[in-house]
Amino acid sequence: MSAAQVSSSRRQSCYLCDLPRMPWAMIWDFTEPVCRGCVNYEGADRIEFVIDTARQLKRSHSFQDGRSPGPQGPGSGASNKQHPAVQAALTAKDTAQLNHLDGATKAAAASGLERYGLTTDRGRFEYTLAARLPNGLNGFPKPGEDGPPELNRQSPNSRGRTGHGLIPQLVPGQLSVPPNLIPQTLLNGPPPGTPGGAPHVLGRGPASSSGLGVPPTASSSGDPKRPGSVSSTDQERELKEKQRNSEALSELTESLRNRAEEWAGKPKAVRDTLLTLTASTPFDVRFKKDHNLLGRVFAFDAASKPGLLDYELKLFVEYPSGSLNVFSSASGVAKQMYQDCMKDFGRGLSSGFKYLEYEKKHGSGDWRLLGDLLPESVRFFKEMVGADMLPQPYLDPGCPMLPSALVNLPRALAAAAAASSSAGSSGQARSGVRKRKASPEPDSADGQMWLTGQPDGIKQLSMAPAGGTPSSSSAAYGVPSAPPPPLGPGHPQRTTPPESAPPNGPSPMAALQSVTDTLGTAHSPKDGQAGGLPPVHSTTSSARRNSSSPVSPASVTGQRRLNSRNGAGSAELSLQVAPTGGAPHPGMDQVHPQNIPDSPMANSGPLCCTICHERLEDTHFVQCPSVPSHKFCFPCSRDSIKAQGATGEVYCPSGEKCPLVGSNVPWAFMQGEIATILAGDVKVKKERDP
C-alpha cells in the first residue's frame, strides 16, 4: 500500500503490527509504512531489518492464505504429518475440494503475487498440503523460554516464527528464503513412511529436494534422515543470538556516540577508571574451562540505573575474536562460552568475571582471572584499578577490525564488513569450538606503535620517518580492498605495540589521522612537560574554519574540526608531530595517558548558543539530539521556528536537517515543544562568571 492509498476512515494499517493508525502516527520514510510505535520499539537503525524479516514471513504466509485447504474435521492434524495410508485414501474429489479456489481467494492470491513480485508459472497442485494447526496461532509456535534470560529479550516482530507448513514447495529460483526462516518440517525431509523420499506434494511428478532454494548443506538428497546440525531449537537459538547481538551493538553505539559528554559529567573516580581501562584495550580473554574459546575486550563504559547515583562498570566483549559479535556483559559472554564448551543450555553462571581469564601481555602466557583485574570494588568505582594488573593492549593483525569501527563506518561499508567477517567465521561458529585466527606478530622494526591514550575504535596510526613516505595501509578501517579515505598525508591503520618495547617506553610516532564521531568533543593533550615529553599545544578552531600553524621542532599542533553534517555529528582531530630536531630518530616519547585531562570538556568553558553565542543557562536551552555541539537559546529557537513555519515540519534551528542517530531521517520538533518555545520569553537566571 502506498502513501496515497489511505482508507476512507483516514486510518492506515502498520506493516509490522497491522493495527489501524491515523496518518500522523505513520512514518513513510522506510520501505514499508510503519507506525511510530514500532519504530520507537525496534529503533530506527534496525527497523529495515525487522521489515525485511516480516516481508519474508508474509511472503510465505500469503501462499497459505491463498492456497491452503479448507477447514477440516477436529480429528485431522497437519496433512504433512498424516500416515501414508491416509494420504493414499484421498480421492480425486477430495483433492479437487482441497485445492479449490473461489473468486475471492483467487483475487487475494493474485494481489499477494503482485505485491511480492512472485511468478505464477507454478503448476496448480505444486504446493504443500499444509493444514491449519489445531493449536498455536496460524502455525506459529510459542517462543522458547529455555535459553538464558539475556537471550530472551526480543521484540514481538523478530521472534523465531518457524511454524510448520508456512513455506510451500516452490520452483527453484522463485524465492530465496534464509535457512533460519524455513520451517523445520521442510528442512528435515519427508516422513519416514513416504516411499522414495518424495515429499507430500500433489502434482505432476515428484518434487526435488532443492525446490525450496535451500542450500545443499541444509537439504538432504535421497536421505530422509534429519540433518544433524539443524533443529528447531538451533533455529530459535540463532534468532535469539541475532537479536542479542543487535541489542548489544545498539548499546555500543549509544555508548560511543555519547562518550565525551557523558564522561564529562561523571565523578572523577569514574572518569579516571574508564580512561585507565580504555588505554589498555583491546586485550584477549578466554574461557577458564576451555582455553580454545577466545574473545577480546575492546571497550568500557559506566552505567547507572535510573534514580540511582551509583555507577557500575560495563564492558564490551567480542566473541569469537574477529567475528564482530558483541556481548555487553561478562556474564553474557561467559554463558555463551559455557554453552559452546559444555553444550549444556540449562545451567546458569553466577558471575562471568570468575570464568574469564585475560592475558596480561600478548604471547607471554600470563593469563589471570578477570575478576582479579576488575573486582567488585573496581566495578562499582570504589577503588582504582591496580596498575600492576593492567593488560597491555594488543590488536590481532589477523582480525584488525574492532566492532566499534562499525559504529563509525558508513552503513553500506559497515554491512559489507560485517558480512565478510561473519562469512569468514561461520565455520568456526557452527562447529561449536570457536578459535581465533593465528597470525604472526608484526616486527617491531616496521616503525609501528600503539597509542595508549586514545579511546578504542580510533587507534589508527600510520608510521613513517621524517622526510619519508607514509606507510601504506592494506585495509582502510579494517575493511579489505577498500581505498583509504583522503583524510590527510597518512593512511589510517590499526597497529599493535612492538613486543620488544616496554609498556610505557619510547616509541616513534608520526601522525594520528582519524577520530570519528564516537566523540562529540575529542580528548586533547594538556600543555606541559612530563617525562621528557615535548610541550603539546592545542589550537581549537570553530565549526566553520580551520586554524593552522607551522609545525616546529619539539612541538605538536592539534587541529580540531567539527563537522555538523557528517552523520549525526562528528569531530575530527588531527595531530601532526614533528620529530625532535627534525631527524628521523625513534626516541620520541609516546603520549602517555596521564597527559589526557580528567574531563574532555574540562576547558570548554560555559555553554553558549550556537547562533548568537550568548551564554546559556545550564538547564534551559534547546539541544539538538543528533549533533552535541548544536545548542540554542530560546529566542534563537523561536526565530527559527517562525522562519520555518510552525504549522509544518520544524527542523534543527541550525538550518540543517540533522539526521537521527543510526538513520537518515531528520528529527523535527513536536507540536508540544513548539508551543512551549513560542509561549513567550522565558526569564531564567544565567550562569555567573567564574
From Swiss-Prot:
Record's compositionally biased regions (Basic and acidic residues): 234-245
GO cellular component, one term: nucleus
GO process annotations (BP): regulation of transcription by RNA polymerase II
Chain intervals with Low complexity compositional bias: 419-431, 464-480, 538-556
Zn-finger (RING-type) residues: 609-656
Gene Ontology MF term list: transcription corepressor activity; zinc ion binding
Location in the cell: Nucleus
Polar residues compositional bias, start-end: 207-222, 557-567
Name listed for the protein in its UniProt record: Interferon regulatory factor 2-binding protein-like A
One Pfam family recorded for the sequence: zf-C3HC4_IRF-2BP1_2
UniProtKB keywords: Coiled coil, Metal-binding, Nucleus, Zinc, Zinc-finger
Region (Disordered): 59-87, 134-251, 419-599
Keyword Nucleus among UniProt keywords: yes
Primary localization: nucleus
Organism: Xenopus laevis
PANTHER family, per the entry: E3 UBIQUITIN-PROTEIN LIGASE IRF2BPL-RELATED (PTHR10816:SF14), MYELIN TRANSCRIPTION FACTOR 1-RELATED (PTHR10816)
Family of this protein: Belongs to the IRF2BP family.
Coiled coil regions in record: 231-263
